Amino acid sequence: MATTNQLIRKGRTTLVEKSKVPALKACPQRRGVCTRVYTTTPKKPNSAMRKVCRVRLTSGFEVSSYIGGEGHNLQEHSVVLIRGGRVKDLPGVRYHTVRGSLDCAGVKDRNQSRSKYGTKRPKK
């Protein structure tokens, strides 16, 4: 425990919280251009071909972003919207692409959790 005199001399140092999504620069989403679209394999207990794209953002950063859902239409110069949110089994992937906005189409034939995948309400 610090004495009153020590606190007057030094004071308490406040811990600075480091951002988990620095490329967004305190914005909810950012726009960017795909520089590479590829698949990669996850960490040890899991097995899959995860769809990922490398994106050059308007903030100047180049980041890896996960493409959720079944199937996508992204190519090299597609313009996408990026949000925060890491993928636990893909090291270095700290962002998600927003489905159904800009050049990224929503997931086809999706009936549940549609808002997360940019799918319109099906016609009756």
UniProtKB/Swiss-Prot annotation:
One of its GO terms (molecular function) is rRNA binding. InterPro entries: NA-bd_OB-fold, Ribosomal_uS12, Ribosomal_uS12_bac. Part of the 30S ribosomal subunit. Contacts proteins S8 and S17. May interact with IF1 in the 30S initiation complex. This is Small ribosomal subunit protein uS12. With S4 and S5 plays an important role in translational accuracy. Coiled coil: none annotated. GO terms for cellular component: small ribosomal subunit. It comes from the Bacteria. It comes from Acinetobacter baylyi (strain ATCC 33305 / BD413 / ADP1). The modification 3-methylthioaspartic acid is found at residue 89. Belongs to the universal ribosomal protein uS12 family. HAMAP family: Ribosomal_uS12_B (MF_00403_B). The keyword rRNA-binding applies. One of its GO terms (biological process) is translation. Keywords: Methylation, Ribonucleoprotein, Ribosomal protein, RNA-binding, rRNA-binding, tRNA-binding.
